Amino acid sequence: MYTSHEDIGYDFEDGPKDKKTLKPHPNIDGGWAWMMVLSSFFVHILIMGSQMALGVLNVEWLEEFHQSRGLTAWVSSLSMGITLIVGPFIGLFINTCGCRQTAIIGGLVNSLGWVLSAYAANVHYLFITFGVAAGLGSGMAYLPAVVMVGRYFQKRRALAQGLSTTGTGFGTFLMTVLLKYLCAEYGWRNAMLIQGAVSLNLCVCGALMRPLSPGKNPNDPGEKDVRGLPAHSTESVKSTGQQGRTEEKDGGLGNEETLCDLQAQECPDQAGHRKNMCALRILKTVSWLTMRVRKGFEDWYSGYFGTASLFTNRMFVAFIFWALFAYSSFVIPFIHLPEIVNLYNLSEQNDVFPLTSIIAIVHIFGKVILGVIADLPCISVWNVFLLANFTLVLSIFILPLMHTYAGLAVICALIGFSSGYFSLMPVVTEDLVGIEHLANAYGIIICANGISALLGPPFAGWIYDITQKYDFSFYICGLLYMIGILFLLIQPCIRIIEQSRRKYMDGAHV
């Protein structure tokens, strides 16, 4: 599904040190790097796979709460949208805390969102617990997974990102089957409790994301509390713990009564030293945290808001408009296909092999095949990208016309294959803005995709509530998608016209 941040050049630091030229590390392109791929693969399964399977729960929520389809669709849309929208802002946590801590916290928040959602009394409760909480946790765990793969790989980065993101397709297939089974056997509330427990594995995946630099972080306050103190303070610490034994070694056995008197006299001094040390440690910790948060915020702010020149690039602005319309057309089938299956009485065939699973499996092959085709020297990446977009929008228009399982299966396969163009988005973005602005530009595109995922499914459900047909939902969303594609087509034409006019003006001056 989302390649999200494949090859986007994120360079967040797990430690607070300034970036330096790194020597070749034994784990680059090998060793522990493949554990990063495995960790990222399971993150994609647990996060993206479960989000693409939310159509199963959407049907259960409609039956439980008896709300409109438009309102109910907001639950899954919030979760999907927030996962993507918060991507650039999660960079602040990564700069401050590191990838490992961010991912572990994200796993806990995501699991908490699933568990609290099991006790929902209405749809509005789910907006907060599942849409916001689970979505935020997903975003916090997802971005570090992609960032760490990029940091551990240089020569094989494309292969590593491709392998890790295939977890989305596998996850969609597995999570759809799992949620259908859990809902049938235990009910949707217990299914969400179990899914919350499963989501705790995100913490395990996060624990595998160890920084490249071996050893402990020298800037950690717990490690430098003593070493970073003045010399006399360090001596005081040593003396308080070992003074009695030192005196015994240096001065012999001595008089026991004299030794007791000396220790009694020094107790107030030791207590004073301990208080001073405790206060000094607290001050050092607060100062260290303040500096680290400040540096992380400055890096994040300069990275995402210091590139206003990107918006002077009209092709990039057109690409943003495309992203605002495009992503919802991919998400809508996942959310509403289970309901369409029920409307057409195709549940028996769909139980054997769910339509959403067809999209997920073919999507894996689509990403690989389209990537290989786009790498051919005789083929333009833009042409492959546009052709895949046209195929996807055509499939969206045709889907409502299919009322049989076989017809829907063929269209779902086309949707899955053509949506593999998501693996080309980083390449297209780099062509537009250059490698130096790739990270920031791609973060903006992902935000636009998140807005599209947030608004698309509720809009389709709202249209169904008015017309009592899903046909118009797909037609209107497909039309909006076509408008986004037209933005991409118009801009090259404008560029050609401007170049021709410039050449004409230059010739006239000569």
Curated annotation (Swiss-Prot):
Q: Entry's Pfam families?
A: MFS_1 (PF07690)
Report a single Gene Ontology molecular function.
symporter activity
The yes or no answer to whether the keyword Methyltransferase is present is no
Bias (Polar residues) occurs at 233-244
* Cellular component, GO, one term: plasma membrane
Enumerate the transmembrane spans: 28-48, 74-94, 103-123, 127-147, 159-179, 191-209, 315-335, 353-373, 379-399, 408-428, 443-463, 474-494
Task: Name the CDD domains on file.
Answer: MFS_MCT14
Q: Which InterPro entries match?
A: MFS, MFS_dom, MFS_trans_sf, Proton-linked_MCT
Keywords attached to this Swiss-Prot or TrEMBL record, sorted alphabetically, are: Cell membrane, Membrane, Symport, Transmembrane, Transmembrane helix, Transport
Q: Where are the stretches annotated Disordered?
A: 214-255
SUPFAM superfamilies in the record = MFS general substrate transporter (SSF103473)
Annotated localization: Cell membrane
What biological-process GO terms show up in the record? Answer: carboxylic acid transmembrane transport
Q: In which broad location class does this protein mainly occur, judging by the first location in its UniProt entry?
A: membrane
Belongs to which family?
A: Belongs to the major facilitator superfamily. Monocarboxylate porter (TC 2.A.1.13) family.
Q: What is this protein called?
A: Monocarboxylate transporter 14
Q: Which organism is it from?
A: Homo sapiens
